[in-house]
Swiss-Prot record:
Source domain of life: Bacteria
InterPro entries: ESAT-6-like_sf, T7SS_ESAT-6-like
Organism: Mycobacterium tuberculosis (strain CDC 1551 / Oshkosh)
UniProt keyword annotation of Magnesium present: no
Pfam family, one: WXG100
Name of the protein in question: ESAT-6-like protein EsxF
Keyword entries, A-Z: Secreted
Gene designation: esxF
Induction details: Transcriptionally regulated by the sigma factor SigM.
Keyword Secreted: yes
Lineage: Bacteria, Bacillati, Actinomycetota, Actinomycetes, Mycobacteriales
Paired cysteines (S-S): none
Amino acid sequence: MGADDTLRVEPAVMQGFAASLDGAAEHLAVQLAELDAQVGQMLGGWRGASGSAYGSAWELWHRGAGEVQLGLSMLAAAIAHAGAGYQHNETASAQVLREVGGG
C-alpha cells in the first residue's frame, strides 16, 4: 500500500508471479516423483526395523512435501484469479470513465 493507504496493483506482475509459482509447483511435483521412485527402490531392498522406521518417516515427509506442492499450486491459481479480476475491473473502470468523459 502507498503512503495514503491506497492499494496499487499491477495485474501483469501478478500474472508473472502466478506463472512463476505454478512453474515452481510443477517442478516440485516432478522432483518429488523422481525422489519417490529412488526412495522406493532403496526401501524395496531394506529389511528390518530401521527400514520400517525410515519408510514411516519418508511417508510423513513425502505427504508434507506434497502439501507444499499443492499449496504452491493453489496460491498460483488464487493470484492469477485475483490479477485477472483486477485487470477486468481496471478495464471496466477505464471504459466507464471514457464514456462519462465523452470519449
